[in-house]
């Protein structure tokens, strides 16, 4: 699984995250990662208290064998299937996911670098998947829309889920490796982008506060439980990336 090709380094054009810092002290240009806007609006319902446990029956869709590096678009396929759309992962990737072969400005954020059909494909972040989702939903004249939730606290992810809104989250491909490593990728405009190895994506389908677990519809591993502590740690280390469809 080739999620270990790419990262970023510090100079005048660098976009770097200190993964050991808190959200408030992240050393990053947030507009770059958030694609200029944070669209999440759950905080408008401040009086809402999410329950201690909740789950949605989001189906498992395997990314294999067709999309060995297509966990992001496959996670979106799971969510759209849950919402009643019979779209398959390859059609979604082929027609709605913006992909580029070269390292140009916006790499990993606005589009998928490489091809999800190839083991040498790299990946993408929340804006690329939100854009793919909205392109598809618009083509269906759907009342649903996708919203970027990046940098939202985990509690907001649970709030959205408990309101019946499926959430896509970025996490680690390898929960046995707590030390996330990073590679440097120099974009065509000179910006150096930090890419986390083992970057992975899944649909958040449930949580249980009392048991300390979350449930993921994971395109690689199936319907799996992860400890709350591990989930939160990797959510932070993979730049707090998330998308909600509602």
Where are these regions (language model features)?
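Loop/turn elements at helix/coil->beta-strand transitions in domains of secreted/extracellular proteins
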Residues: 140-144, 163-168, 211-212, 240
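Short, solvent-exposed, low-complexity loop/linker segments
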Residues: 158-167, 171-179
């Amino acid at each position: 699984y080739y999620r270990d090709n790419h990262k970023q380094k510090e100079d005048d054009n660098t976009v770097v995250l200190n993964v050991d810092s808190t959200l408030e002290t992240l050393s990053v240009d947030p507009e770059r990662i958030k694609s200029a806007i944070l669209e999440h609006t759950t905080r408008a319902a401040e009086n809402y208290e999410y329950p201690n446990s909740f789950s949605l029956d989001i189906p498992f869709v395997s990314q294999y064998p067709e999309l060995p590096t297509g966990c992001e678009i496959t996670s979106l396929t799971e969510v759209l299937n849950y919402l009643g759309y019979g779209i398959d992962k390859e059609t979604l990737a082929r027609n709605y996911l913006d992909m580029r072969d070269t390292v140009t400005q916006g790499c990993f954020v606005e589009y998928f670098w490489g091809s999800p059909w190839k083991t040498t494909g790299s990946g993408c972040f929340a804006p690329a998947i939100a854009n793919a989702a909205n392109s598809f939903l618009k083509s269906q004249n759907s009342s649903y829309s996708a919203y970027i939730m990046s940098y939202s606290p985990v509690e907001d992810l649970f709030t959205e889920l408990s309101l019946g809104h499926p959430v896509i989250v970025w996490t680690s491909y390898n929960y046995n490796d707590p030390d996330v490593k990073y590679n440097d990728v120099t974009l065509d405009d000179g910006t150096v982008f930090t890419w986390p190895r083992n970057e992975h994506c899944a649909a958040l389908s449930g949580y249980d506060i009392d048991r300390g677990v979350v449930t993921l519809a994971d395109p690689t591993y199936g319907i799996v439980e992860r400890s709350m502590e591990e989930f939160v740690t990797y959510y932070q280390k993979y730049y707090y990336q998330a998308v909600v469809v509602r």
